[in-house]
């Protein structure tokens, strides 16, 4: 995987942060961030997507694993944005763990 391939995560996170700071009516991200259940709605989605990813792995369905992992990563990015944690914060923690 190249840095350019990973840049899509930064791009998606930037869009999520923009939606957080500049809400757009009808935006799915805004509907999660502004849901009446608050962070619990986002966590429900993270849990749902985690379960779907696990089932895809169990079924050894490569296409479904990729699809569900993408959904999971997206909802994890929304969760991070909601809790004011950046991808840089995560990258720094990962760097600490690689040695």
UniProtKB/Swiss-Prot annotation:
Compartments where located: Cytoplasm
This protein's encoding gene: hisE
Major enzyme class: hydrolase
Similarity-based family: Belongs to the PRA-PH family.
GO biological process, one term: L-histidine biosynthetic process
Keywords: Amino-acid biosynthesis, ATP-binding, Cytoplasm, Histidine biosynthesis, Hydrolase, Nucleotide-binding
Higher taxonomy: Archaea, Methanobacteriati, Methanobacteriota, Stenosarchaea group, Methanomicrobia
Coiled-coil region list: none
Protein name: Phosphoribosyl-ATP pyrophosphatase
Stored Pfam families: PRA-PH
Biological source species: Methanococcoides burtonii (strain DSM 6242 / NBRC 107633 / OCM 468 / ACE-M)
Keyword Nucleotide-binding listed: yes
């Amino acid at each position: 995987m190249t840095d350019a391939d990973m840049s899509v995560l930064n791009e998606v996170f930037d869009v999520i942060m923009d939606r957080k700071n500049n809400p757009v009516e009808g935006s799915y991200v805004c509907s999660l961030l502004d849901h009446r259940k608050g962070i619990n709605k986002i966590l429900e989605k993270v849990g749902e997507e985690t379960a779907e990813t696990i089932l895809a792995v169990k079924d050894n369905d490569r296409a479904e694993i990729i699809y569900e992992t993408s959904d999971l990563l997206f909802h994890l990015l929304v969760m991070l944005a909601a809790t004011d944690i950046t991808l840089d914060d995560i990258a720094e923690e990962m760097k600490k763990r690689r040695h």
